[in-house]
Amino acid sequence: YTNALDPWKKLKIASEKNGTPEVFALAQILKISAWHKTLESFGPMPYSHAADATMNIPFDSEKEVYTAMFEELTAAIEELTEKAENGVNVMGAYDAVYAGDATKWVKYGNSLMLRLAMRVRFADAELAKKYATQAVNHSIGVMTAKDDAAQMSQGAGMTFRNNIEWLAGNYNEARMGSSIFSYLMGYEDPRLSVYFLPMDGNASYGVEAFDGKTYQAVPAGHANAQNDIYKSCSKPNIQSGTPTYWLRASEVYFLRAEAALVWEGFGSADSWYKQGIDM
């Protein structure tokens, strides 16, 4: 939340000064990308007046924040759609996500709108349906291909290190927990070796799994602190160059499947779900 606030405010001021609303459109999408996670984690939050120069910032309700996010996404998508239709590259030299491809940003914005719509459907079905419909029926639409994914790895002359790998490798704090291990073992889920690395061949501890490899999970209830117990357990199967994903086409297909289950006019839930798996 706080890390996104200052850059967003600077881009807002710069775009107004330079007459570049498309830059502010990108800033809005990035802000919502970060702040919707804060909203879902903590509930009511400062939003509409978050950047005001005052010590007394009011909190907005969850409904107010979601409503504002939908409206801001709509405006940002509209601005970038015009640029996409005219083949305009938006800040390509500084864009580490899509290299200035306005069409990709519109797809991401619409996909983010669909995600938010499906997250509010139990609280406000009418609002959810309105913006889910708007997202999928947009002229450019939502993500449909793997290369539509919003992710950080390399771009704009920069290389990014995966933050989970950094925590696992440098701080020895990100390890496999006993709950996920129990589920994966119980169902003999082949994703076990995709998600986590087996123990070193010289390890004298661990549990042999159905795939013939040995894993060790952090015991349930263990103290959340850096220590040798964490260090000795199975790491996430993530490398330094593994992209950090914000949103992928596979999630969008699953969201469309969910929408199709509850509303008419959203296609086949079965078809969307299978496409999500294939993606």
Show which residues each predicted segment covers.
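Structured, solvent-exposed acidic/aromatic patches
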Residues: Y1-M279
